[in-house]
């Protein structure tokens, strides 16, 4: 169906499930925005002070990619149980986070309940700071209240979803402009331009 209207390639930004790429008969490129957002901390911290933490087992590839971008050798993983949507319980943290600035990359944040629980668990286990990189800030329901009362020190979100004045209600939120990334990946390269 998409081919019938001239679409020959799709570019996604932190796709929620990479398996979706296999459902198309043409290339689907996924850009890990959290790698680009990692520049927001790479100049502020010594790499030895950082620990990248996957918020769950499903986010390990994203976290490993961010760790590689930052030059962080090890990875920590939050083992959690999810009873229902927007509710989770941290069972264990696998990896060394004591005294570390923990970077938690994820594709989206909805009510912030899961990230709030994770931030408290990380601080309880000795994390010095918790910084989250989130590509798609849904921020529904009581998300702002959850973030404000969480142990998150900084929440860096992209502007893939306009959050309006929510960042004014939460001093922990920094918005990262992704328009240069979108321009880079959507501008035709010289080989794609048809001479007139």
Each model region followed by its residue ranges:
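Proline-rich low-complexity regions
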Residues: 27, 55, 188-190
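PRPP/pyrophosphate-binding module of the type I phosphoribosyltransferase fold
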Residues: 4, 42-43, 48-168
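Short acidic, glycine/proline-enriched helix-loop-strand junctions
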Residues: 18-40, 145, 149-154, 160, ...
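Hydrophobic alpha-helical segments within soluble ligand-binding/sensing domains
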Residues: 1-5, 31-50, 179-187
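Conserved beta-strand scaffold positions in the cores of enzyme catalytic domains, especially
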Residues: 10, 28-30, 52, 75-77, ...
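Single conserved hydrophobic/aromatic residue that forms the stacking wall/gate
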Residues: 185-196
């Amino acid at each position: 169906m998409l081919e019938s209207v001239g679409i020959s390639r799709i570019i996604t930004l932190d796709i929620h499930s990479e398996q979706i790429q296999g459902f198309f008969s043409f290339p689907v490129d996924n850009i890990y925005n959290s790698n680009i957002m990692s520049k927001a901390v790479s100049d502020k911290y010594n790499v030895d002070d950082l620990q990248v933490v996957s918020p769950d087992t499903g986010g390990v590839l994203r976290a490993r990619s961010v760790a590689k971008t930052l030059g962080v050798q090890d990875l920590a993983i939050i083992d959690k149980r999810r009873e229902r949507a927007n509710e989770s319980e941290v069972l264990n943290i696998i990896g060394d986070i004591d005294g570390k600035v923990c970077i938690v990359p994820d594709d989206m944040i909805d009510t912030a309940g899961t990230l709030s629980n994770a931030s408290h668990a990380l601080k309880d286990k000795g994390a010095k700071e918790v910084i989250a990189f989130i590509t798609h800030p849904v921020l529904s329901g009581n998300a702002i209240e959850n973030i404000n009362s969480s142990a998150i020190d900084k929440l860096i979100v992209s502007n893939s979803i306009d959050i309006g004045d929510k960042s004014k209600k939460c001093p922990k939120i920094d918005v990262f402009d992704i328009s240069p990334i979108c321009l880079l990946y959507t501008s035709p390269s010289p080989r794609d331009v048809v001479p007139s």
